């Protein structure tokens, strides 16, 4: 990918957060252009009182049984990304217990937030940022919540690669160089509801807790080379936990 970055600013470390160009792999085939603190949980504030949930383990309380939704962790996406981080951080047994809480699992990210906004559930695990922001702006009583176990840095949909032997390679190169510009990143962050890794892109429309902070300690990065190499093993664990619960 290095050779197709035509604009000098794109290869300049000062353009990007942490003063470096972020790659998800040592061969520089995956460029990371969005990086943000993942909000592991979202709550409906009419159903969850302040302080009721401060830890992931609080979700195991019987009172939350049938009142939790989650983005499907058995496919690539936000639910799996969160599972991958925390299964390494707090262990597999927690997830077996959480599955027994009769959580509502869906692959429809908007549906999950709709359930939360309408009060069908009280808590959502791995909420979708874009849908959260839309419901919040519409007046839904939603808040993000970071448990005391900590949070991690995520790229979400914010990475790009050039596929070998794909049609229209020149158009793909042109798009990559545009999407990484300030204009391209401003459009991306406004439409997706997540920050850009560029330091010159506005963030005033985003929840402050989502923004990367230099003095914050994050427990993992879901775009690290280690995370990329661990995906297959973690996906197997996710299926081991959730397939029987989902009737597969």
What would you call each of these model-derived segments?
Residues 61-65, 87-88, 117, 121, ...:
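Sec-exported extracytoplasmic/periplasmic mature domains
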Residues 56, 112-113, 121, 131, ...:
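Short, hydrophobic alpha-helical packing/hinge segments within bilobed ligand-binding/sensory domains
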Residues 219-248:
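Conserved C-terminal helix/tail region of periplasmic/extracytoplasmic solute-binding proteins
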Residues 96-99, 104-106, 140-166:
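Periplasmic-binding protein-like
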Residues 158-222:
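Mature extracytoplasmic/periplasmic domains
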Residues 123-143:
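A ligand-binding cleft/hinge motif common to bilobed small-molecule-binding domains
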Residues 45, 72, 128-129, 192:
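Short secondary-structure boundary segments
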Residues 1-113, 117-120, 154:
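Extracytoplasmic ligand-binding site segments that recognize negatively charged/polar headgroups
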